[in-house]
Amino acid sequence: MSASTMTPGEIVSELDKYIIGQNRAKRAVAVALRNRWRRQQVADPLRHEIHPKNILMIGPTGVGKTEIARRLAKLANAPFIKIEATKFTEVGYVGRDVDTIIRDLTEFSIKQTRELEMRRVRSHAEDAAEDRILDVLVPPARNAMGEPQRDDGNTTRQTFRKRLREGSLDDLEIEIDIAQATPQLDVMTPPGMEEMAEQLRGMFAGLARDKTKPKKIKVKEAFKLIIEEEAAKRVNEDDLRAAAIANVEQNGIVFLDEIDKIAARQESGGADVSRQGVQRDLLPLVEGTTVNTRYGMVRTDHILFIASGAFHLSRPSDLIPELQGRFPIRVELDSLSADDFVRILSETDASLVKQYTALLATEDVQLAFTEDGIKRLAELAFSVNERTENIGARRLYTVMEKLLEELSFDAGASSGQSVTIDAAYVDAQLSEAASSQDLARYVL
């Protein structure tokens, strides 16, 4: 089921599989996604006036802000890009300007649309690839124009077609004309001029288009290459670009991470010279403007922006007022408790417990985590967070890696063993590091 047709409740249920708690953030994101679908159902004059309500997520590091965006990207069948606000500088300074956000989003949409189109024409491309390989194996008669006159009733051709489909010819080497690969050209340009580099690459790529050369290759590999080639022939580039740009304009989502890092603090000095400039450059993008990309003009009026930040050293009110007004929905994410850590380790679909169990199972080492073992692991991770820097759920990675360090190193020699990870095992491996503040700071 596509996220565009899912109800907010279904979207939240899907996010619950990977993210514990943070219901307010999940609900806000789910409603924003559903509003996309609702807007499409509204009649045209009013539909154009309905703009997405951008979201600002506020919360400490490691509580799920980025994970919500990452899972949303997989869930939403829409152009999506996650970028760090700190990568951009004010126009005129060395660095990337904010328009590259929309250019990158358009590139993603072109790639996504091309993949969909290639899948749509794949069956026709497979038939054409089959015929081209059979033309080499059983050369047909040719007309005055040199075009093959295929006789599908030919018994020999049908025999080879059957063998080709069965895979018995996969290792046979044939010589066939294959389109030349586009030369990879690396263009060095000053920061902020990436668009010029893309145009130069496109220009040189066009020079090698439609050129073929004979190549000796196995039937199996030839079949894959020719399918790609034939599918590309059947995709109309102009229609593809128009569809991709429309998809960006109507369904695009930009996740703007670390926005707190470009909020100028009142007491800060000259080091923040370009921070307010970046905020001012973001204003028209978030409000609605037209950005020139190499595929055409892209309007940003209906692109959804989701910003997030920890706001440890600054506050949302430190953002310039105009930008604050462009993010009307504000959601605070909660710090994680020890109980949340237990749920993260045991309830999520791709929990660390499942990941490490699967990894060591490849070496025939069977891990079994008990409830008290998981609880003790969560308590230690929470305790280290309380006494040192609070990095949220990311602390579980460090603690789990330290816990299984010896086991992972000796896994090859321990093949066939079963190891139970209970509270006693966790204490034996981690209690010393967790109890010493210095060790906890540098080891965990």
Swiss-Prot record:
Coiled coil: none annotated. Its main location: cytoplasm. Keywords: ATP-binding, Chaperone, Cytoplasm, Nucleotide-binding. GO terms for molecular function: ATP binding; ATP hydrolysis activity; peptidase activity; proteasome-activating activity. A double ring-shaped homohexamer of HslV is capped on each side by a ring-shaped HslU homohexamer. The assembly of the HslU/HslV complex is dependent on binding of ATP. ATP binds at I20, G62, V63, G64, K65, T66, E67, D257, E322, R394. It is found in: Cytoplasm. ATPase subunit of a proteasome-like degradation complex; this subunit has chaperone activity. The binding of ATP and its subsequent hydrolysis by HslU are essential for unfolding of protein substrates subsequently hydrolyzed by HslV. HslU recognizes the N-terminal part of its protein substrates and unfolds these before they are guided to HslV for hydrolysis. Belongs to the ClpX chaperone family. HslU subfamily. One of its GO terms (biological process) is protein unfolding. It holds the Pfam family AAA_2. This is ATP-dependent protease ATPase subunit HslU. It comes from the Bacteria. One of its GO terms (cellular component) is HslUV protease complex.
